[in-house]
Amino acid sequence: MKRRDFSLAAISAATVTGLPVAAQAQGPAAKKPVEGTDYLSLDKRVPTDVGAGKIEVIEFFWYSCPHCNAFEPQFAAWKKAAPKDVVVQRVPVRFRDDFEAQQRAYYVFESLNLVEAMHGKLFHAIHAERQQLNTAQALAAWVGKNGLPEQKFIETFNSFGVASKARRATQLQDAFKVQGVPALGVAGRFYTDGSLTQTMDRALQVAEYLIGEVRRGR
């Protein structure tokens, strides 16, 4: 979903139709990615949080985005199978102020080591159960029904650590010039998304190509 399309009407229509990005019609056999068409090189490198010899791949996402929901199972499998020299991070975007609650919710899960337990559940609650979970209060009530005490969620949600991570996420989003989600950033140097590649299947192929380029010293 492109950044300019994040209106309630667009979200509602997309949710109804499902719009499974990874299931869109595939084109011809994969060809070598083309810079400027399949991916973009950043004008300024973005510092990464990984050590020497490691390659960072970032998924930019938003819980209420139907495309991100459709992509999540595929990306989770890709993340699990990533080579040892690839460090995969998820970064929730904040295109508008009302995105902040869900952005912070992800970092609450991360801080409490609950991403694996809660990340997919939150997507499911929003897109399959059609729950409106876009405020701190609504999210706190939801986690309270899913094994995390509301007070613990609220305390962590309002903590300095979560606020700092959310601020850093927005900085990364801006540094990569994210125009829509889901999107991928590679090695602090490259950016691709479904608008460039037409499908997120292809975006993952492009990310793998770029990982190879980084390994080869590009």
Model regions and ranges:
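Extracytoplasmic thiol/disulfide redox context detector
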Residues: 2-97, 212-218
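C-terminal cap of thioredoxin/glutaredoxin-like
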Residues: 5, 145-218
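Structural microenvironment flanking redox-active thiols in thiol-disulfide oxidoreductases
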Residues: 81-112, 116-143
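Sec/Tat-exported extracytoplasmic proteins
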Residues: 61-64, 75, 79-82, 109-113, ...
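Solvent-exposed loop/turn segments at secondary-structure junctions
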Residues: 64-67, 94-98, 125-128, 161-162, ...
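Extracytoplasmic/secreted proteins, especially bacterial periplasmic and envelope-associated proteins
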Residues: 56-59, 70, 74-77, 100-104, ...
